[in-house]
């Protein structure tokens, strides 16, 4: 390239970078809709009992959501009790409110009516940090970084020991698979976990939660 072409290309790159930075700054400067209430206390988990009581919710101001775009409730006076240690499955058609039900527990949204509690504590009365620290979330579309299996498991806890990583993998029932690999926990997973199957990626994500 000639010096003039280099200058033109640099100016174009600079403009794109500035535009991207402005968009990022707008996102970072946006105050979250969900805030801790005055006097919020830390969540104290004793047994892990979860209670949805007469819960209502609708996406009144959301253009694209899981149903309820026209203001009709996605969740309409729902009661649900989950006992400590109990495993449940929410089954239903697309747009039926399954993902929304899960999103209300860590307060990604607030209920319009009713209440959700953990061990008798309304989730709106506790700090978001303590609430979300107590909840593990594994989404359908798992994102893995182009690093080792061990690094991906320890993503949320960079200082984790090899023993802690191995224990998390054991609890996620993926330890036998990892140990069968020639490089074990040092195996590179590829971009977005391309070298692992969908189920294996899910279990790595579950191990993250346990860690």
Predicted segment positions?
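Cytosolic ends of transmembrane helices, especially the final helix of ABC transmembrane type-1 domains
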Residues: 1-27
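Signal-transduction coiled-coil helices of two-component systems
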Residues: 14, 31-35
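Extended non-transmembrane interhelical loops and adjacent amphipathic helices
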Residues: 18-29, 49-53, 166
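Conserved E/DxxT/N motif and adjacent residues on the DHp alpha2 helix
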Residues: 26, 33, 154
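Two-component histidine kinase transmitter core
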Residues: 30-31, 109
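ABC-type nucleotide-binding domain
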Residues: 36, 43-211
């Amino acid at each position: 390239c000639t010096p003039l072409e280099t200058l033109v290309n640099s100016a174009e790159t600079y403009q794109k970078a500035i535009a991207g930075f402005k968009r990022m700054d707008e996102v970072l400067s946006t105050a979250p809709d969900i805030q801790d209430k005055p006097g919020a206390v830390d969540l104290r988990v004793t047994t892990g009992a979860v209670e949805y009581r007469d819960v209502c919710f609708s996406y009144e101001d959301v253009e694209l959501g899981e149903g309820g775009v026209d203001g009709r409730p996605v969740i309409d006076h729902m009661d649900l009790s989950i006992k400590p240690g109990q495993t449940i499955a929410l089954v239903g058609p697309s747009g039926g409110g399954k993902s929304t039900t899960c999103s209300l527990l860590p307060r990604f949204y607030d209920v319009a009516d009713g209440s959700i509690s953990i061990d008798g504590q309304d989730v709106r009365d506790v700090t978001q940090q303590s609430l979300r620290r107590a909840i593990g979330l594994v989404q359908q579309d798992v994102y893995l970084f182009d690093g080792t299996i061990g690094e991906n498991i320890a993503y949320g806890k960079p200082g984790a020991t090899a023993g802690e990583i191995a224990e998390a993998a054991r609890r996620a029932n993926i330890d036998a698979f990892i140990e069968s690999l020639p490089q074990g926990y040092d195996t590179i997973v590829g971009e977005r976990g391309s070298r692992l199957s969908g189920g294996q990626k899910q279990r790595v994500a579950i191990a993250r939660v346990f860690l």
